[in-house]
């Protein structure tokens, strides 16, 4: 099973133990929001609870032993706009050591820059 598929299944099932096995101890997650970065413990604390974001239409665009790129639609428990999320992951020792995301809000009034 691919690392991204295993991650998505663990996240969707709220399986924090499985996520802990997939995420490298030195993992850094940069969501490019508010200048924050998150560690493995931050990610695990965010997963499996009532406020965990839910994903759909998950697609793996590219994955090999070193990196992966995925896309999904993410819905948040705080009623904020859903987002189309692109994720880049770097792997080390078969685990996610780096994850960065970029997102586009999917609100009805969203307009492409320059339109």
Which ranges hold each PLM region?
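A short gly/proline-enriched turn/hairpin at secondary-structure junctions
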Residues: 28-37
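A beta-strand edge to alpha-helix "cap/lid" segment located at domain peripheries
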Residues: 30, 44-115
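Amphipathic alpha-helical repeat scaffolds
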Residues: 5-9
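A sequence-level detector of short linear motifs
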Residues: 38-39, 98
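Short, well-ordered alpha-helical segments enriched in acidic and aromatic residues
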Residues: 13-28
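Structural motif corresponding to alpha-helix initiation and N-cap regions
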Residues: 12, 40, 54-55
């Amino acid at each position: 099973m691919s690392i991204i598929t295993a991650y998505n299944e663990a996240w969707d099932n709220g399986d924090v133990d499985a996520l802990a096995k997939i995420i490298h101890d030195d993992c850094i997650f940069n969501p490019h929001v508010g200048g924050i970065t998150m560690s493995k413990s931050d990610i695990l604390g965010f997963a499996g609870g009532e406020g965990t974001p839910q994903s759909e239409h998950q697609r793996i665009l590219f994955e090999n032993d070193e990196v992966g790129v995925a896309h999904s639609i993410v819905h948040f428990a705080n009623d904020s706009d859903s987002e189309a999320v692109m994720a880049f992951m770097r792997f080390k020792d078969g685990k996610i050591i780096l994850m960065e995301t970029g997102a586009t809000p999917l609100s009805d009034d969203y307009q492409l820059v320059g339109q």
